[in-house]
């Protein structure tokens, strides 16, 4: 895989080697650091800045383990409550026996659905309508973004049922045995990660990885494993053949989902859709060659244009439709560009949001600054560190871009 920065390439290759060893224990496929994701473990930032990783004390380790158990068990209980609420809601998808299906694996943003009172396709606009026009049976297999409160999910289930959205959720098909397996994962995962940590040695890269893994040790880990169980349970349903079109960011949850689908006895095709403008600095976006042997990579990957293609053994990488960017071409012809604002577009990683807000507050900007938070973020959580002369906007990016003199973001 080619990166413009040779240090990123070196870090990518190092993590590739370590993840290949780690994934022999399937529980570690759920670890986001080993998936090369951006995390608060700050492996990427620490390595590129040549910083010395902070030492890990016994107190920190004990604290991380306790917080891990508390956070994961509370989240697991909320997940079980959500499953009960799903049963109460009556939301259900009926699979036609022996019929081929297209499964749309994409994010469902909870706040957006509740605020709008309906589900609006944001990642594959136009695709559901196309499938319906062609009389192709399809169903969503959603990745929930922003799930914390089961009561909010209950509202979502009712909205989906009322609007007759074809959604097949994990809450419908996971069994008691699956929930017991999740509980087992919660208790065994720390031991798997600890065994891997003990094998790390004294190189600078090992120290950076060691610190990153411990800093994220207390994250909620079981959700990625639940995607594996969900996909595996999907394969027991009476589908004909399955074609899965997946919004593909190569996250730990994606890898687990594909691994589960590969247990299907009939024909399964997985298409990973990278139909977005990707930054070269996000390592997880680029599939790892060594992941293929673990069944963690799609059969085909669609990218946003010829400039985004890359070589990957035994996996086709082709140009797909830029479904989300139609407005850019339309606006370029129909709208004038005023250049009246500085537009700051923030990511969905908390530590980077805080860092960017700190940087931009020290600059004397020549024009009014408007801050656009990621749709999944609650901007009010950052109200105290947003400069008073800056404005937070909820306008769409389509309306903001023609007004921007400069756009500031993270990459």
Indicate residue ranges for each PLM-predicted region.
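Catalytic-core helical/loop segments in enzymes performing group transfer/polymerization on anionic/lipid-linked
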Residues: 1-411
């Amino acid at each position: 895989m080619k990166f413009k920065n040779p240090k990123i390439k070196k870090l990518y290759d190092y993590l590739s080697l370590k993840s290949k060893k780690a994934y022999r224990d399937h529980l570690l496929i759920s670890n986001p650091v080993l998936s090369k994701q951006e995390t608060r473990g700050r492996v990427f930032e620490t390595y590129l800045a040549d910083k010395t990783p902070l030492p890990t004390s016994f107190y920190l380790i004990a604290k991380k383990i306790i917080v891990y158990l508390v956070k994961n068990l509370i989240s697991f209980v909320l997940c079980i409550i959500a499953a009960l609420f799903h049963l109460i809601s009556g939301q259900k998808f009926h699979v036609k026996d022996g019929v081929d299906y297209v499964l749309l694996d994409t994010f469902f943003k909870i706040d957006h659905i509740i605020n709008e009172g309906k589900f609006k396709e944001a990642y594959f606009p136009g695709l559901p309508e196309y499938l319906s026009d062609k009389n192709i049976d399809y169903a969503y297999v959603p990745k929930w973004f922003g799930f914390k409160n089961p009561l909010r999910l209950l509202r979502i289930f009712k909205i989906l049922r009322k609007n007759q959205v074809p959604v097949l959720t994990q809450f419908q098909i996971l069994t008691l045995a699956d929930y017991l397996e999740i509980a087992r994962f919660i208790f065994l995962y720390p031991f798997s990660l600890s065994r891997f940590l003990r094998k790390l040695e004294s190189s600078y890269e090992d120290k950076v990885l060691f610190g990153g893994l411990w800093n994220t040790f207390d994250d909620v880990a079981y959700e990625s494993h639940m995607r594996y169980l969900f996909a595996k349970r999907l394969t027991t349903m009476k589908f004909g053949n399955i074609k899965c079109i997946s919004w593909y960011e190569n996250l730990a949850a994606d890898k687990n989902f594909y691994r589960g689908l590969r247990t299907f006895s009939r024909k399964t095709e997985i298409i990973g859709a990278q139909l977005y403008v990707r930054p070269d600095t996000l390592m997880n976006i680029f599939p790892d060659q060594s992941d293929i042997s673990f069944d963690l990579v799609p059969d085909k990957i669609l990218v946003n244009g010829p400039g985004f293609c890359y070589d990957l053994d035994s996996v086709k990488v082709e140009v797909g439709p830029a479904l989300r960017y139609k407005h850019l071409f339309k606006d370029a012809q129909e709208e004038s560009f005023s250049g009246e604002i500085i537009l700051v577009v923030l990511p969905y990683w908390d530590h980077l949001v805080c860092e960017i807000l700190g940087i931009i507050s020290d600059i004397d900007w020549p024009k009014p600054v408007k801050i656009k938070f990621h749709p999944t973020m609650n901007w009010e959580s950052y109200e105290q560190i947003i400069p008073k002369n800056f404005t937070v906007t909820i306008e769409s990016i389509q309306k903001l871009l023609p007004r921007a003199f400069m756009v500031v973001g993270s990459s």
